[in-house]
């Protein structure tokens, strides 16, 4: 008989919740994590008494009451509403695209005026079968919004021209003919008071966790310890890249502590101009309505994934989707491995 019933590779949301629930049911679990902390990409680090989202902004939102009630047992949430702002040159626009955006863009006041303006721009281009992301976006919202708020940001995000990206990446663009600038439609939304890390500490209380462990460096040993494995890493890496490597994008974060109480007046400002190298600036104190004397900002840069980088999201194109399907078929045939999480499924 093996020492553990479950070996859980990765202490992010999927791995931590699995470990918590399995332990509640009397199963013996070992959680291993390659980083020096739990929490995955939701990890928050306290800097200058501000909870800094180390791996980019994470706003908890759901319309599922069961999920909302479940997460409440680990933290109290505030009422934060995600209302990002887009900066193009010296202009600021409300996101998602709504009447505030259209008023700033064209000076229109009523929903009818805004709808007519967008329809006019779409019909002017006469795109019936979009061949790429650029044509798809223009066919949905017109050229003005595309040029100012979509093009530069998207090209930085993917590292490719919009004319080289497939149309299916954008199936729809949310357009609201109201003055509601709440980014999410979900019923429940907020930020855990005190940061996300406490959630994981409470989830993993009493469970054996080992940090700074590379599963692949000692794979045979760790696989021998448990009856079943829960794997939350890169699915292609698990299978030894036997069909080839999936392509990912990575991110770089540059933090600055500033001796001012308020830098940009909003938690998230997207920079949509191509010549600005970063995609957005996060000012973390605004997630929890902070009043500290200083502030912490993070500039977020999108970059090509290189070995040793953290993979954040897979490149969504035909080649990668076909490759993923092959790995998914392999995963589905594993009887003693559960794949989950952002990269595992």
Question: Locations of the language-model features?
Answer:
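Dinucleotide-binding Rossmann-like beta1-alpha1 core, especially the glycine-rich loop
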Residues: 48-123
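Glycine-rich FAD pyrophosphate-binding loop
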Residues: 20-48
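Active-site/ligand-binding neighborhood in enzyme catalytic cores
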Residues: 89-96, 100-228, 232, 239
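Mid-domain catalytic core of redox enzymes
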Residues: 25, 215-326, 330
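Short FAD-binding loop at a beta-strand-to-alpha-helix junction that anchors the flavin cofactor
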Residues: 331-345
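Short loop/edge segments at beta-strand edges and connector loops
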Residues: 10, 81, 209-215, 341
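Beta1/beta-strand and adjacent pyrophosphate-binding region of the FAD-binding site
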Residues: 2-14, 30
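Short, well-ordered alpha-helix to beta-strand connector turns
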Residues: 4, 26, 207, 225-227, ...
């Amino acid at each position: 008989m093996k020492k553990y019933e479950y070996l859980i590779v990765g202490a992010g949301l999927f791995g931590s919740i699995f470990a918590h629930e399995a332990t509640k049911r009397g199963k013996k679990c070992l959680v291993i994590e390659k980083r020096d902390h739990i929490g995955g990409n939701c990890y928050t680090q306290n800097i200058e008494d501000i909870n800094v989202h180390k791996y980019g902004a994470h706003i908890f939102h759901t319309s599922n009451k069961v999920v909302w009630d479940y997460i409440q047992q680990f933290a109290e949430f505030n009422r934060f509403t995600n209302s990002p702002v887009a900066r193009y040159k010296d202009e600021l626009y409300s996101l998602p695209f709504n009447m505030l955006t259209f008023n700033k863009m064209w000076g229109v006041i009523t929903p009818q005026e805004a709808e007519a303006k967008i329809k006019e721009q779409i019909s002017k281009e006469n795109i019936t079968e979009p061949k790429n992301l650029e044509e798809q976006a223009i066919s949905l919202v017109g050229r003005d919004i595309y040029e100012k708020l979509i093009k530069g940001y998207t090209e930085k995000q993917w590292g490719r021209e919009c004319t080289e990206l497939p149309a299916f990446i954008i199936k729809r663009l949310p357009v609201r003919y109201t003055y509601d600038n709440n980014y999410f439609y979900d019923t429940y939304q907020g930020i855990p008071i005190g940061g996300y890390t406490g959630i994981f500490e409470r989830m993993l209380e009493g469970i054996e966790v080992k940090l700074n462990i590379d599963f692949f460096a000692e794979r045979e040993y760790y696989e021998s310890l448990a009856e079943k494995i829960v794997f939350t890493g890169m699915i292609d890496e698990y299978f030894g890249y036997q069909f080839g490597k999936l392509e990912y994008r990575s991110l770089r974060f540059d933090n600055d502590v500033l001796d001012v109480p308020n830098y940009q007046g909003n938690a998230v400002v997207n920079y949509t101009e191509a010549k600005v190298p970063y995609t957005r600036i996060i000012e973390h104190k605004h997630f929890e309505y902070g009043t500290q004397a200083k502030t912490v900002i993070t500039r977020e840069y999108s970059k090509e994934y290189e070995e040793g980088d953290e993979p954040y999201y897979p490149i969504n194109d035909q080649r990668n989707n076909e490759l993923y399907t092959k790995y998914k078929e392999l995963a589905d045939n594993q009887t003693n491995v559960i794949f989950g999480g952002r990269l595992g499924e």
